[in-house]
Amino acid sequence: MNVAEFHQKVEQVWQQIEEKIDDEALSIDTEIHGAVCTLTFDDESQIIINKQEAMLELWLASKLGGFHFAFRDGEWVTAEGRSFWTHLEEAFARHGEQISF
């Protein structure tokens, strides 16, 4: 994957997240600035998803900790093979919201 494809794939993830939050009418503020997508919950807690261009990775930070994802076989996964979407759903739950991607 080249850098342009990387950015396109991450931006698709961000778009999916925004659309799902809107579809579910969740009270979560979504802000994207440069390489960082910030999801802010009612209690002011946050999930941060950012691009790591040099490594072609997607990073996720939440109350559960920090995780790194590489794009393999058509999906974002950790080195252990856990899906980005699984981690994100668990992070939402930890922040008090139920969502399914």
From Swiss-Prot:
Superkingdom as given in the UniProt entry: Bacteria
UniProt keyword Transferase, yes or no: no
GO cellular component entries: cytoplasm
Function: Involved in iron-sulfur (Fe-S) cluster assembly. May act as a regulator of Fe-S biogenesis.
Residue ranges of coiled coil: none
Family recorded in the similarity comment: Belongs to the frataxin family.
Encoding gene, per UniProt annotation: cyaY
Protein name per Swiss-Prot or TrEMBL: Iron-sulfur cluster assembly protein CyaY
Gene Ontology terms, MF aspect: ferric iron binding
UniProt entry keywords in alphabetical sequence: Iron, Metal-binding
Metal-binding is among the record's keywords: yes
GO BP terms: iron-sulfur cluster assembly
